[in-house]
């Protein structure tokens, strides 16, 4: 009897030993870094990863908060497989320019999404009417590692302003996320909230309710200076239909939201991810309708300035989607 029990235990042990590693090996873990809560990236990233996990056999996923600059660096370090960024940011990352002191040469384009619009909101009743007026004010350009923070720094530079010069003149620069920025403006602790996001943005809609906001524009002279410093940024507008109370379009700069992948992501898996996401495009509209409606699958290669992942390119060739 004792020998029979020992034999059964050994058989069970062998079954566990033989089959558990095989099942674990069959699971491929995909890590995505998207954006902060309060924006479009985080909820859409979470929805995308859930779609991938539910529809691609043997794949497990996660979606974490991040920023356009930091996400590129995370992929280069092998900490992420997929990341949200902007086309001009990925170009700088790939080439080691701007905020990147080293080349992120593992970056590959997966898909272009909707336009990212740089928005500078100030309280409606403030005496701030130009970017130049921010030289001694209290601002929130975003968190360190956010693409919006880098663009804010660039726009201010075109007007002869730096984060350091603001502080020297008695102003403050608060590197906080969307939710904290909204709280600071509602409490009267900041004068300008900056972000590059879809338009309209939930945080600004909230701020437009209280205290009420208006937007600072970028004039043609300074638009040219910005383009000289960063050719990847393009002139665009905050349309007058974006937020209640607007009476005219506001000129600003913009870019294209992009999902990038690691060159180490297997081609077949990249193909399946792109194919699966586009097959469930209507499901993503339930999360952020306006953002996804502005993300035309036929423009999946819009603004691309880095190599396209071979797996993604295979899908685009099948669908007849060509480079912009």
Which residues does each PLM region occupy?
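Acidic, polar ligand-binding/catalytic clefts
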Residues: 80-114, 198-202
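Ligand-binding clefts/hinges and TM-proximal coupling segments of bilobed small-molecule sensing domains
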Residues: 137-155, 233-304
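Bacterial N-terminal signal peptides that target proteins for export
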Residues: 1-10
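Bilobed "Venus flytrap"/periplasmic-binding protein-like clamshell domains
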Residues: 29-61, 116-187, 302, 306-311
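Pocket-lining segment of extracytoplasmic ligand-binding domains
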Residues: 87, 96-99, 126, 162-265
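C-terminal segment of classical bacterial N-terminal signal peptides
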Residues: 15-24
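An extracytoplasmic/periplasmic, membrane-proximal ligand-sensing/linker region
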Residues: 180, 186-187, 192, 197-215, ...
């Amino acid at each position: 009897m004792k020998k029979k029990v020992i034999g059964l235990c050994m058989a069970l042990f062998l079954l566990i030993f033989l089959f558990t590693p095989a099942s674990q090996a069959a699971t491929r873990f995909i890590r995505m870094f998207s954006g902060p809560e309060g924006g479009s990236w985080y909820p859409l990233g979470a929805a995308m990863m859930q779609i991938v996990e539910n529809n691609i056999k043997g794949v497990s996923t996660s979606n974490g908060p991040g920023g356009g600059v930091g996400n590129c660096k995370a992929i280069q370090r092998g900490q992420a497989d997929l990341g949200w960024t902007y086309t001009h940011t990925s170009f700088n990352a790939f080439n080691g320019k701007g905020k990147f002191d080293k080349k992120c040469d593992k970056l590959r384009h997966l898909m272009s999404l909707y336009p990212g619009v740089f928005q500078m909101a100030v309280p409606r009743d403030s005496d701030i009417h130009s970017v130049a007026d921010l030289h001694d004010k209290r601002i929130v350009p975003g968190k360190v590692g956010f693409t919006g923070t880098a663009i804010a720094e660039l726009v201010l530079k075109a007007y002869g302003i730096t984060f350091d010069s603001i502080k020297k003149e008695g102003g403050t620069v608060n590197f906080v996320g969307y939710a904290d920025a909204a709280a600071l403006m509602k409490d009267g602790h900041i004068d300008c909230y900056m972000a590059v996001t879809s338009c309209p943005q939930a945080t600004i809609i909230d701020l437009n309710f209280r205290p009420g906001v208006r937007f600072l524009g970028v004039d043609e002279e300074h638009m040219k200076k910005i383009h000289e410093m960063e050719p990847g940024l393009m002139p665009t507008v905050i349309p007058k239909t974006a937020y209640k109370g607007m009476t005219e379009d506001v000129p600003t700069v913009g870019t294209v939201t992009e999902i990038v992948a690691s060159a180490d992501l297997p081609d077949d898996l990249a193909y399946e991810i792109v194919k699966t996401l586009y097959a469930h495009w209507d499901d993503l509209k339930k999360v952020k309708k306006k953002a996804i409606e502005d993300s035309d699958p036929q423009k999946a290669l819009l603004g691309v300035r880095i190599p396209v992942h071979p797996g993604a390119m295979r899908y685009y060739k099948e669908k007849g989607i060509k480079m912009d």
